[in-house]
């Protein structure tokens, strides 16, 4: 329970806190828990024992800095030292040894693996324990089942069949009598009957033969093994059989873990100690008792809701890293055992460190983690498109991944919003497409209880004691606790304590919405944004938008590109500052002092007599090819305080998030250029660099050794290439810094040696070999060339040389991209569109004061989409622009009074009209609209038009990366049709529906060309080029295209032969021809 002393007001927690807390738990507890499980390695023949101790382990500071790890493609990790003991005969050695490196989380909440920023997503899984459900079969008979889920995700089912016999289904195929299972777990029949509530039901179904099978534990284990492993014949009881059963069944299906034990005790009213984390016979019997009670009506039909958050748990970064550490220690154990055997063969005296030092052993830890980060679906490349994306990525929760659901098989119920999500998982923010509802985002106040894995939400406790003290206590409720509280919603969301609460308020109780007296309320919400994620909380007037459009908006804000000159929004929600702060893109002063000097690379600060150098990020490439850049914001000689902003990051202004630009928009049709979500823009946005962004692309090349053993060479001396293409290379063959490069230019010159074959020798070469014995070698040119669409300025070149023959060269090229036709823009209300035309500013519609409009949106995009928030935003933005004001508006302002949003907008427009003495800003006949003029003719438009200042973002979906054309290129090997996709230089596919469209117009010859010459007719497509160049007639071939041949071959594989026959008109002779 948390309490704030002053007024009980709660502050928003740090958005990256969840990742940091998880990693700290792994370092402080997870490492110790796994080291405690490490067994003592003994070799009885030679009286040797090796042991690791959980206490006193140490992590050294990383040997390299973050920047260098990224620069040199290394892993940012820390060396782990553990206390070890080696008993060798009578000699006991204790030593602190290094067992490898562990990746370390940086200040962004991410890891650097091989130079790439990666982040671990929280996974939401079904909690281990037991779950009951009852359903009717096709005959209307009730079927009750209980499912036991282990900590590893293994499932076992208890069920009662039509003959009222109780079975345990340990896998999909095998089912085993509950008596056999209990006996195999160590209970005899007398113990079973003494520990159940319905012994007569247990006695009713076993016959004499079955009773014989459970006479002893050994017989029960044999019976269980035969049925579980589907083995026939006479088996003999042995220790190896027990071990196999232990490994295959009991470890996978019966380990409940700490969380599972708590859930099992709570569900079945047991009092088994928490440290007993395995399934016991007592659990099985209690679970069967409950099932019998459900089936025969003596119990309550209380089905478990599998989608309720109380039945889910979060696997955070701590759990996943701890699992990998346990896996690495298991591998270390095997490696040490091998080393011990090797030591005795060589007859050398071992020490604890020499057992772990061999190269393969010492890198086990880091290779395990690198494999995990490279292959695990929830360890993702960190999304660095903009500061919002960096903040949001670590707060994602996903039902996907190992042990979870899949996009193709998940049901609608598992994707749906559940009442228990309130204040924990955002009801809006999820992905679109196949994974809708399976990936979500944590609400801004939610926190994870790392011990039990539940998501908690804060509330104000309304108790008599708190009312007397005039204090508010903040309580964090887990999903299973808030069912017992009356939680006030609606008007009680107000932040102002002076507002008198109504007598009757809407409330939530046990997943139902009620209206009850204020005196009966237990807790209330603490913040209007409490239910939303960061993305949803940045949408002003979200309550006026349809939820589908709010979802699109929260996704599209994460795709916004940082612009060259950022601008903060006129209308916001107030959460922009904390989002920018927690993204760590700005530089914050860690101590007070005085600025000595500042430039684009560093800031020098004098504090307590010391000079501190603070490095800045200058034009660094992000994972999404956007430009990360920090600009100093403090002049020389200025005194600064702790926490003050020293340098702004990309897409931040004054410490606030600034993803887009405030531009003048009009909602009106214009010559069809804004049909179907197209957007018409003014050329001012291009010429004044309003939507100009910088992008950095990385190109790399590596030298290797050929199969003949000769090394590749980086050089400027490349024969057969024009001098023009090599103009930017320095004497080493690498492009110069600051060069302007165009498509096709050589960035790094490289030659690969090739030994010429005997047949390719020319006469002179043969003579040289005969006289001097010289081998003639030819070199193939394998240089790094700039691909299509890559033109720009070289801003950085990295030469990484690990050994003389292994050289990697990376070239970074900066591109300046203005907005152009085909780029995608969007507002913060899901109103997205593609630029269709860029008009000269004199042709754009203009206002009554002569200001030309910047963007023209289609008004038909508003009513059907029901995202009316954009109308409020644009009108209030216009008022704010004229009054030089910024607004920060909390959602659901209708809780104060009806039509609060509309009243606010109209009052501000009226104030702006009065102060600027412009009556057109607020016209009472059509408030918010204005008569505007056609820029081409000067005539006013017939209808008044809605105008305003909207905050519009430029998205990362840009035409430069999408547009593609092909004349010739690669073909698929089987069908001989052009390959698919821009990356492969692919062609356009004319599919079935496109063929129908052409058939509808009767264009037979065009269709013939498309399906043969331009596609997969091998001979015809070679001849058509010749015919086109020389102006000859295109030949008409009778043989079929390649795809038809593929069809014939596929029919042959089904034993169907396809032939055609030519029948003579004269004598009706049949000439058979093969297809």
Curated annotation (Swiss-Prot):
Reactions it catalyzes: RNA(n) + a ribonucleoside 5'-triphosphate = RNA(n+1) + diphosphate
BP-aspect Gene Ontology terms: DNA-templated transcription
Keyword Nucleotidyltransferase assigned: yes
Location, primary (coarse class): plastid
Subcellular location: Plastid, Chloroplast
Keywords of the record: Chloroplast, DNA-directed RNA polymerase, Nucleotidyltransferase, Plastid, Transcription, Transferase
Molecular function (Gene Ontology), one example: ribonucleoside binding
Domain of life per record: Eukaryota
InterPro entries noted in UniProt: DNA-dir_RNA_pol_bsu_ext_1_sf, DNA-dir_RNA_pol_su2, DNA-dir_RNAP_su2_dom, DNA-dir_RNAP_su2_hyb_sf, RNA_pol_bsu_bac, RNA_pol_bsu_CS, RNA_pol_Rpb2_2, RNA_pol_Rpb2_2_sf
EC number(s) from the headed UniProt entry: 2.7.7.6
The protein's enzyme class: transferase
One GO cellular component, as annotated: mitochondrion
HAMAP family reported for this sequence: RNApol_bact_RpoB (MF_01321)
Family: Belongs to the RNA polymerase beta chain family.
Quaternary data: In plastids the minimal PEP RNA polymerase catalytic core is composed of four subunits: alpha, beta, beta', and beta''. When a (nuclear-encoded) sigma factor is associated with the core the holoenzyme is formed, which can initiate transcription.
Its biological purpose: DNA-dependent RNA polymerase catalyzes the transcription of DNA into RNA using the four ribonucleoside triphosphates as substrates.
Name of this protein: DNA-directed RNA polymerase subunit beta
Taxonomic lineage from the root: Eukaryota, Viridiplantae, Streptophyta, Embryophyta, Tracheophyta
């Amino acid at each position: 329970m948390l309490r704030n002393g002053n007024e009980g007001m709660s502050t928003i927690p740090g958005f990256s806190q969840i990742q940091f807390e998880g990693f700290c738990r792994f370092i402080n507890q997870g490492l110790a828990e796994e080291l405690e499980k490490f067994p003592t390695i003994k070799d009885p023949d030679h009286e040797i024992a090796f042991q690791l101790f959980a206490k006193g382990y140490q992590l050294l500071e990383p040997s390299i800095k973050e920047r260098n790890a990224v620069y040199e493609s290394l892993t940012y990790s820390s060396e782990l030292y553990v206390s070890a003991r080696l008993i060798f005969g009578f000699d006991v050695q204790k030593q602190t040894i290094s067992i490898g490196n562990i990746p370390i989380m940086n200040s962004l909440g991410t890891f650097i693996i091989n130079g790439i920023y990666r982040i671990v997503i929280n996974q939401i899984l079904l909690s281990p324990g037991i779950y009951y459900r009852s359903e009717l079969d096709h005959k209307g008979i009730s079927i009750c089942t209980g499912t036991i889920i282990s900590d590893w995700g293994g499932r076992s089912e208890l069920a009662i069949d039509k003959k009222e016999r109780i079975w345990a289904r340990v896998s999909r195929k095998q089912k085993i009598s509950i008596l056999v299972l209990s006996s195999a777990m160590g209970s005899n029949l007398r113990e079973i009957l003494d520990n159940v509530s319905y012994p007569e039901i247990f006695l009713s179904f076993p016959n004499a033969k079955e009773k014989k099978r459970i006479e002893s534990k050994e017989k029960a284990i044999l019976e269980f093994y035969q049925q579980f492993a589907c083995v026939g014949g006479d088996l003999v009881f042995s220790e190896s059989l027990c071990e196999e059963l232990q490994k295959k069944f009991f470890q996978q299906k019966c380990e409940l873990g700490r969380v599972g034990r708590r859930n099992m005790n709570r569900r079945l009213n047991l009092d088994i100690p928490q440290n007993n984390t395995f399934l016991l016979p007592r659990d099985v019997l209690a679970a069967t008792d409950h099932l019998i009670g459900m089936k025969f009506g003596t119990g309550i039909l209380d089905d478990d809701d599998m989608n309720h958050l109380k039945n889910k748990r979060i696997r955070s970064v701590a759990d996943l890293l701890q699992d990998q550490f346990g896996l690495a220690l298991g591998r270390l154990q095997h490696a040490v055992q091998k080393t011990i055997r090797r030591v005795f063969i060589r007859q050398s005296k071992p020490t604890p460190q020499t057992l772990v030092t061999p190269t393969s052993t010492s890198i086990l830890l880091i290779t395990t983690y690198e494999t995990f980060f490279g292959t695990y679906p929830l360890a993702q490349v960190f999304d660095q498109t903009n500061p919002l994306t960096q903040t949001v990525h670590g707060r994602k929760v996903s039902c996907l991944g190992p042990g979870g659901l899949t996009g193709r098989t998940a049901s609608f119920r598992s994707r749906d919003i559940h009442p228990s999500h309130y204040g924990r998982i955002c009801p809006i923010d999820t992905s679109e497409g196949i994974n809708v509802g399976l990936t979500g985002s944590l609400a801004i106040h939610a926190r994870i209880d790392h011990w039990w894995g539940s998501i908690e939400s804060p509330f104000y406790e309304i108790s008599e004691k708190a009312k007397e003290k005039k204090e508010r206590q903040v309580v964090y409720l887990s999903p299973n606790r808030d069912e017992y509280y009356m939680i006030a919603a609606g008007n009680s969301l107000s932040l102002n304590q002076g507002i008198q609460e109504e007598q009757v308020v809407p409330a939530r109780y046990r997943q139902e919405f009620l209206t009850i007296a204020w005196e009966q309320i237990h807790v209330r919400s603490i913040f209007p944004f409490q239910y939303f994620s960061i993305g949803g909380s940045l949408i002003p007037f979200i309550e006026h938008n349809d939820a589908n459009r709010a979802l699109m908006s929260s996704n599209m804000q994460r795709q916004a590109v940082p612009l060259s000159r950022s601008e903060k929004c006129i209308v916001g929600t107030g959460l922009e500052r904390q989002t920018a702060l927690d993204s760590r893109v700005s530089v914050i002063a860690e101590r007070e002092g005085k600025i000595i000097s500042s430039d684009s690379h560093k800031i020098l600060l004098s504090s307590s007599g010391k000079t501190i150098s603070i490095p800045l990020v200058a034009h660094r490439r992000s994972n999404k090819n956007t430009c990360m850049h920090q600009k100093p914001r403090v002049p020389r000689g200025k005194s600064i305080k702790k926490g003050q902003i020293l340098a702004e990051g990309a897409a931040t202004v004054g410490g606030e998030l600034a993803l887009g630009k405030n531009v003048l928009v009009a909602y009106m049709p214009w010559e069809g250029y804004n049909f179907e979500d197209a957007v018409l823009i003014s050329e001012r946005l291009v010429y004044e660099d309003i939507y100009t962004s910088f992008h950095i692309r990385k190109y790399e090349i590596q030298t290797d050794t050929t199969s003949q053993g000769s090394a590749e060479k980086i050089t400027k001396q490349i024969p057969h290439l024009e001098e023009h293409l090599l103009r930017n290379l320095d004497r080493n063959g690498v492009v110069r810094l600051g060069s302007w490069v165009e498509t096709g230019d050589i960035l790094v010159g490289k030659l690969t040696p090739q030994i010429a074959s005997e047949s390719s020798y020319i006469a002179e070469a043969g003579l040289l070999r005969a006289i001097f014995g010289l081998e003639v070698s030819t070199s193939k040119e394998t240089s790094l060339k700039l691909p299509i669409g890559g033109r720009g300025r070289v801003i950085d070149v990295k030469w990484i040389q690990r050994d003389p023959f292994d050289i990697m060269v990376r070239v970074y090229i900066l591109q300046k991209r203005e907005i152009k036709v085909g780029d995608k823009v969007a507002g913060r209300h899901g109103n997205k569109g593609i630029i269709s035309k860029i008009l000269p500013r004199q042709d754009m519609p203009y206002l009554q004061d002569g200001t030309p409009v910047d963007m023209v949106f289609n008004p038909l995009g508003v009513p059907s989409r029901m995202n009316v928030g954009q109308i409020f935003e644009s009108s209030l933005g216009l008022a704010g622009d004229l009054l030089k004001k910024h607004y920060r508006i909390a959602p659901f302002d209708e809780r104060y009074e009806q039509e609060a949003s509309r009243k606010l907008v109209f009052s501000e427009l009226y104030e702006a009209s009065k102060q600027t003495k412009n009556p057109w800003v607020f016209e009472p006949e059509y408030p918010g609209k204005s008569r505007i003029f056609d820029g081409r003719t000067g005539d006013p438009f017939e209808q008044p038009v809605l105008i305003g200042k909207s905050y519009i973002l430029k998205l990362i979906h840009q035409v430069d990366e999408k547009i593609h054309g092909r004349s010739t290129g690669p073909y698929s090997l089987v069908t001989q049709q052009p390959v698919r996709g821009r990356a492969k230089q692919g062609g356009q596919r004319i599919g079935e529906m496109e063929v129908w469209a052409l058939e509808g117009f009767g264009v037979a010859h065009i269709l013939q060309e498309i399906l043969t010459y331009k596609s997969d007719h091998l001979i015809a497509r070679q001849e058509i080029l010749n015919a086109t160049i020389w102006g000859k007639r295109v030949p008409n071939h009778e043989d079929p295209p390649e795809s038809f041949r593929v069809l014939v071959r596929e029919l042959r594989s089904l034993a169907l032969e396809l032939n055609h026959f030519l029948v003579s008109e004269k004598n009706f002779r049949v000439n058979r021809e093969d297809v």
